[in-house]
Amino acid sequence: MAILDELVTQIENPDLRARIATEVEKLAKQKKFGLVFEEHLPECTPLWDIPVKAGRKAALKTGHVNDFYTVLKIEDGVATCLNKDKSATAEFPVEELVCVAEFGEPIYPYLKPIDTVCNAPDSDLWHTLIEADNYHALQLLEYLYAGKVDCIYIDPPYNKEDSKDWKYNCNYVDKNDTFRHSKWLSMMQKRLRLAKGLLNPNDSVLIVTIDDTEYLHLGCLLEEVFPEAKITMVSSVINPAGKAKKGGVDFSRTDEYIYFLQFGNSVVLPEVRDVSKTPIAWETFRRHSLANGRGKHGVGACGPNQFYAIYVDNKTKKIVEFGEPLPEDMSRFSVKQIEGCTAVFPVRDNGVEMNWAAPPWTAKKLYEGGYLRVGNATMDKPQQYTIKYLTKGVIKDVEQGKVTIEGIDDEGYIIGYYEAGRAKVPTTAWSKIAHNATSYGTDILNKIFTDERFNYPKSLYAVRDCLTLFLANKPNSLIVDFFAGSGTTLHAANLLNAEDGGQRRCIMVTNNEVSESEAKSLTKRGYQAGDKEWEQLGIAQYVTWPRTVCSVLGCDVKGKPLAGDYGVEAEDYVIDEESAIVSKTTGKPLKTTVYKKTVKQLYPSLAQMKKADGFKANAAFFKLGFLDKNAVALGRQFKELLPVLWLKAGAHGPCPSLEEAAEVPAMLVLPENHFAVLTDESQYEAFAAQVNGEDSITTVYIVTDSEPGYREMISGLHAEDTYQLYRDYLDNFRINHGGR
């Protein structure tokens, strides 16, 4: 409705304007079916790099960007301006104004380098953070990476009424909307349409997180924008304690929702194997069957050498000696005694003498190998200690490496287990300790910043797990997050790369808004948007980039090494073989399984990574700016657009740059960056020879206004990707020109 309202205000005839406004209001109140909402034009774009001049549109830096004026004249630093509806003029100091462009007016973006962090100088992988309104950043990215993105992960603002003080102003509601979700849906729709052009239609995934405020409307919107996608919604517990709603008379919310949209051949990969450590089975060394009893003969009988004493030290519970086999007519009570030891024989509880599973010389070898041990003490029974051993099959598995050996017990026997598990398919209901947003989101940020700079960051492991489901088998994938927030997605990508040696690249986009309370404080102190004091407290410069730098280098914002590792421990319960529950009635052990509490490592490989070691990664920070096409010489145009060419070529190596006063070179061949640019067609022969001699050059840009000439030149090049650039460089990257 905002579009209609805007058009209605432009009707000069007051009677006609009033009648049409009345009819529009009636239409707005009619019942709607399906996802029908009022469209909103994107907000005007502030052009901070363009000077305020007569004839241009401008808005107050402290006002709303859509409340713009037309500058009529400037005298002595004061601009005389005509308001938007042309009803009145006003005067403002020029320094209080910023040029703006309306939706549909072409603008010319460039990437201004702000900072870099390099912790892997030998790697040509560079992540990217772009400070920008994500709508315009997406327009630029659509040109750079159309159909090339493997995964988009976004955590958009949740449109909550009480969230104005966040770094993101999450409350997207227009007072004139009859449907309170319209402005938010309009904002999301325009960005999702652009995002659609980025995704690889043959195999990619879009991941969107949301809470109960907008999840129903978002689901409908996703179905509308992406009818070809397979859509799955997952419920994920992020706050086990629950968050009560206003008044405390409603359900306490513990979870949020994650939409997974799969395109083409995209498949959900099994989660890392749900490994259960199955302990190796220790069998009783005493034979079981009566046919195995002492003195028995015939089928199933044991040999004459399997009835003997095993001497157990009563203090250490270790075996000190294996006695000689006893003849059938010799009593077990007649054997020698060793001080401090018990002579243990294979005897049933009812006194029936049995046999051991092997003769003493074999038993000795088993004991020395760690394959035979003393079990529980049963001093009130004929056999005072249980003796246990590993069967031939288990021993064979140990020797063949099928059993994982954790170590040797103090008594000398091996501690081992089978890694029994299966590929686990993810479910649609997640309740994972590591996804707790407080413990593994807020706490991680607080250790980096040592103060609270961002509310409600995502759990690092929640994002890591989402990415893993689709990118574990794509080590060179491209990830985009255009609601970057605190920068969790890039942090998670680095974590995933560190696990498997991958080269996944992440591009993050975020604005540089300050919170509402910070804006009020800064305004009171005389600062306004665009001032250094204002900008340095914005989310991109104050949260996203510092978090990226610190996580890569392994330190907090004060340079102190981060403590701990990236593992996550959780309580677990395992079978306790050494304990038993005794019946109060009979005094005998109950045949029940006893469990003991222990600590389980949820991410064993991550537990080996010290946070202080950082990541072998690099990242570049840019600010999206806009140039005045009519006021920028070709030389500066080329210089300012070089980072865009670098990004389009894959962001290999450090972003190249040219000196401020440097002329446009006839050619640029940059093996470290994997791309080359020809600006002077007369130098083609030398250029082609140099490019074809560099195997690392995979992208070539040819500057020419001639389509036939371009085709002829690229026919002699070996590069994988070639692009034509117009001589008026800014025209190659013009965005915002209507229709979106």
What is each of the regions a protein language model found here?
Residues 139:
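Conserved Rossmann-fold cofactor-binding substructure of NAD(P)-dependent oxidoreductases
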Residues 136, 158, 214, 484, ...:
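Short, glycine/acidic-enriched loop or turn micro-motifs at the edges of active sites
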Residues 448-461:
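Conserved SAM-binding loop and adjacent beta-strand
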Residues 114-124, 168-176, 437-451:
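Short glycine/proline-rich turn/loop motifs
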Residues 147-164, 479-493, 641:
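Conserved proline-anchored active-site loop of SAM-dependent methyltransferases
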Residues 1-121, 125-127, 142-146, 150, ...:
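Accessory, often C-terminal, charged low-complexity segments
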Residues 162-179, 517:
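Aromatic- and acidic-residue-enriched carbohydrate-binding clefts of CAZyme catalytic domains
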